[in-house]
Amino acid sequence: MSEEDKKDPPKSIEDLMKLLSMGESLTEPQQKQMKDYKFWKTQPVPSFDEKIDSEGPIDQTKTPDDIPDTPLPLLNEFEWSTVDLEKTDQLDEVYKLLYENYVEDQDATFRFKYSHEFFNWALKPPGWRTEWHAGVRVKETGKLVAFIAAIPITLKLNKSQKVIPSVEINFLCVHKKLRSKRLAPVMIKEITRRVNKYDIWQALYTGGVVLPSPVATCRYTHRPINWSKLYDVGFSHLPANQTKSGMLANYALPNTTKTQGLRSMKIEDLDQVYDLLHKFQEKFDIVQVFEKDELAHWLLGGKSTDTSSNVIKSYVVENSEGSLTDFFSYYLLPFTVLDNPSHDELGIAYLYYYASDTAFKNDDESAYKQRLSSLMSDALVTSKKYNVDVFNCLSSQDNPYFIKNCKFGSGDGFLNYYLFNYKTWPITGGIDPQTKELVEDKSSGVGVILL
């Protein structure tokens, strides 16, 4: 890419979607052979052409005593640092590092608008450990120049009924000026060492770049809420033979929701939501198993009501008998818009977990699809009061059932799911494996949502 190209701002929501996953998806000819991945060749992950004939760990069985107590060596000018997110100044350091370096394009017209509340939600769920927030500092100045995080997560593969204590790896970020120092592979090895010391040997992670070897691939889709604003900042274009007024009319949403009994989730709803989600997740091949305190954290942000959180929004549907029949949730992570005379922020919502008891009524699948479409239409409506401009979801879960009806458009960004030190059979991500097009009206096998 030329320097001139680098300065061009993204011109479509699809470009935005690519950056959300820290890299662009690659076409088949661009996928390198295993021998070219010097680092991943040394790691317990399947190669691209490996035939999966059994399910289970790849590496030989170890114990924490087999793992060194000392961190991996770094280049002499750097030192390891355990980042204490309980301290505001260190939280600010992580914010600054990610804000300035998490998006590749130095001249990008937007930045992730993280907040302390978002980091506390994303990085401090029940069971979190300070030592799993690893940083690298410059010895001479103490400046934080790299960061990687792991949080505890319990995975379940429903076909085999195997439950896997794991971690989710996220927020791997190296300062742009130090990308040639090969810090990222060392950081992955170091976070692996720290996690292994707690007798955890598997991890789940995602990325837009194709590495050896995805267990599932999902496609980004997006639904404009404020089309006019997206057009103003250059993320939406005016299609041929369309007018601005026509586009506004196409994406217009009502001001009120339609589902009877819909309301914000409260902590008192936790038991019913837990049972509903637990049963609903039996539909998918790979899911996260939640304890109730974990679910309270992820759906309520550790608050007593949904309205207390500025990050996660959760809604339930209560019937006339006081039973909860449905719920949905989404989280908010806006972008700061730079160098735009009219707008300084882009509101973005990301679909999170949901469930409906209509899914359990096998005699009428069409009713379930209609119910999902109605629920997600209401999710779009509720997002307007949080100044959301575009609502994103993947082709995971049962999202293909409503994506078209709710006017989500397929982006050209993809998100690949990877299991570290575990092999399992490929899982459908709601898209055709060859064409990568969305498979409408067909469930995916991916029931776990990563930030």
Curated annotation (Swiss-Prot):
Q: Where in the cell is it found?
A: Cytoplasm
Write down the EC number: 2.3.1.97
Broad class of where this protein is predominantly found: cytoplasm
Tagged with keyword Cell membrane: no
What are the catalytic residues?
451
UniProt keyword annotation of Transmembrane helix present: no
Protein name, per record: Glycylpeptide N-tetradecanoyltransferase
Q: Which organism is it from?
A: Debaryomyces hansenii (strain ATCC 36239 / CBS 767 / BCRC 21394 / JCM 1990 / NBRC 0083 / IGC 2968)
